[in-house]
């Protein structure tokens, strides 16, 4: 499972930290744990989305209407794109692409925020199936949380890989948390 793989990777990275000079290990230890926490937060968000959707399906669900599907599709695509950008940066150590990925995270966060506010307004009007609307709102909120966790992961990975003197750090630290 993904959780088992994450634990295995974490163990290997901890063993690697033991082989590094103490000063470097201490400096990077915090960033290492923050990146692990970000990954755990993402898994938890995905589980929360899955649980809500699964429960909705198990209870003779009313499907999401075409308007909501059309609204969410570009957000989903944007989230997938950001995930792929972050994956590439971390996988290949391409930290020069970090500012662009950070901007993409901020744009995605704003887009999810706009969508969340619109959905909350629709819920308040009482139109539509309230259960479906709440499941949709949950999807939006958890997707937005995924973007926030990705931003935190980027920051932690940058610090872990390049140290605190990185020129990219000022970009990441200046963002709203």
Predicted regions and their residues:
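Cytosolic, long alpha-helical scaffolding segments
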Residues: 1-177
């Amino acid at each position: 499972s993904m959780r088992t793989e994450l634990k295995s990777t974490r163990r290997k990275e901890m063993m690697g930290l033991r082989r590094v000079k103490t000063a470097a290990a201490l400096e990077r230890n915090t960033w290492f744990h923050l990146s692990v926490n970000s990954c755990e937060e993402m898994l938890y968000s995905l589980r929360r989305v899955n649980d809500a959707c699964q429960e909705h399906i198990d209870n003779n669900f009313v499907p999401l209407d075409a308007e909501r599907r059309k609204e969410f599709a570009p957000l989903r695509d944007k989230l997938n794109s950001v995930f792929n950008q972050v994956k590439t940066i971390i996988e290949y150590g391409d930290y020069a692409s970090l500012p662009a990925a950070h901007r993409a995270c901020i744009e995605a966060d704003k887009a999810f925020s706009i969508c969340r506010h619109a959905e909350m307004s629709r819920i308040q009007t009482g139109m539509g199936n309230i259960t479906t609307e709440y499941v949709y709102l949950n999807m939006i909120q958890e997707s937005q949380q995924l973007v926030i966790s990705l931003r935190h992961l980027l920051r932690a990975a940058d610090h872990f890989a390049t140290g605190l003197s990185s020129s990219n750090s000022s970009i990441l630290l200046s963002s709203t948390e």
